[in-house]
Amino acid sequence: MDLAERLSALDVDGLTDRALRTAQLGLIAARVGFDAHVFAMTDPATGIVTSPHATVPMVAPGDLPAVIRRRYSTASVTQWRTVLAELGVTDTVSMTLQDRWGRWGFLELWRCSAGFTDRERDRLAGLPPVLTASLRMAVARTFTVPDAPPTRLESGVILLDDDLQVRSVTSGAGRALMRMLPPTEPGPPVPAAAYNVVAALLAHEDGIWPGEPWARVHLGASRWASVRAERLEDRIAVSIGPSTTTERADLFARAHQLSPRQSEVLHLALHGMDTRAIADELVIAHSTTEDHLKALLAKTDSTSRHQLLARALGG
């Protein structure tokens, strides 16, 4: 099997998105070596990093915020390669992992000595569709994991300056950060989600980053939080709170590859409309609405309308 086939055949049952990426990187490294990597998941709507998976020994922990800021503030691939060259990186392979439903992440492999050969690049060329699908399906699987026991997510705020230095963290935000990216060593968690939305805000202010500075971050089980950055004079406030019904439904629809019409039907069903009311609202036949609902059940692997709505809402 070639590398893409090996990745497609990977048993993902029971794997978290982080464990999945670790397994995928292991298969890739067995065929194509690299000195460092960044394998990030992003919000499919905004493209902002939500879950980094990185081994970058050439970046000191204290320099991480500056590197993240420069990733968003560089307007071209050439400029980003200049940033990497300053870190001692001599060659890269970059993959944007996106489909018609959004941008799910990216993978960068870095080398600090010999460059990637044409043969190695050929081995990697077929990976983006496979990796894209795997990340999208990893998001979809989160909606089927029950919360046990259910825990309420407290809203919280992190204050940072323009250099991405944390100035204060509320207790609710601190607990949310622990769930987003638990530290592997004693000490506070790295506020990666905050760094990324703040970097996006700063780049947006400079006219470089096109989208709004917010993203949905997985907290474990079926829980999703929304993280937003907002300017407050010489500080930037990052708010963390439960994703709204609309935000969850959008992510649910993207992850399950729903069509625009199926997404409309889901939205109306989530707001309590029955089949007849949905048909009237969309000015379509009752039988057509039933067909859309059946397609929703099939695409989301739901056994009933109740289960479909519970998964989309997080119940």
Give the positions of each predicted feature.
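Regulatory hinge/linker segments at domain boundaries
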Residues: 146-150, 242-260
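Short, basic, alpha-helical segments at the C-terminal edge of helix-turn-helix-like DNA-binding modules
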Residues: 305-315
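The N-cap/first-turn positions of alpha helices
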Residues: 261-265
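Recognition helix of helix-turn-helix DNA-binding domains
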Residues: 259, 272-307
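PAS-family sensory/regulatory modules and their coupling/dimerization elements
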Residues: 196-245
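PAS-family sensory domains
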Residues: 153-215
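Regulatory input/activation interfaces that engage signals or partners
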Residues: 1-129, 133, 137, 211-213
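Short alpha-helical interdomain "coupling" segment at the junction between an upstream regulatory sensor module
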Residues: 135-151, 286
